[in-house]
C-alpha cells in the first residue's frame, strides 16, 4: 500500500512506520506537530492544519496534493483517525479510486473507524463536492 490512515503518531507508531517503509507522514491536526515523534528518523513530515467541525475544500485539496506528490509511501492522521482522517480518506477514494460519494461516506461512517456523527459537516462536504472540479485542482496542483 502506498497510502494509509492512522491515529496520532507515538513511539510505537513511529517504529512501525519505519518497519513498513513509510517515508512520509501527513498530519491533519491543528495543534500538535509530529516533530518530536519523527526526531531521529528520515520520515518527511507534511502538515495541513484542520478542525473536524470546519474542514474546508481548500484544506482537502491541499492534503490530496500532498498525497498525490509523495515520493514514498505515506500515512495520514489526525488525533483519533476518524473524522478529519476519514474526510481525507473519503476524498482520496473518490478522487483517485473513483469510489462513489455514497460508498465513501458509508466507508467513513460505518467502516469501523469511529466516525463521530456530530460532524455532519463532513458528510455534507462530501455530498456537495464538485468531484470533477476538485479532481482538476488536485491533479493540476504541483508540489506544495
Regions found by a protein language model. Give the residues of each.
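Single conserved hydrophobic/aromatic residue that forms the stacking wall/gate
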Residues: 1-13
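Second-shell loop/turn segments in exported
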Residues: 7, 22, 49-53, 79, ...
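PTP/DSP superfamily signal
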Residues: 53, 64-72, 91-144
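Conserved strand-to-helix beginnings and helix N-cap segments that scaffold or border functional pockets
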Residues: 57-60, 86, 119
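A phosphate-binding catalytic loop at a beta-strand-loop-alpha-helix junction
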Residues: 71-90
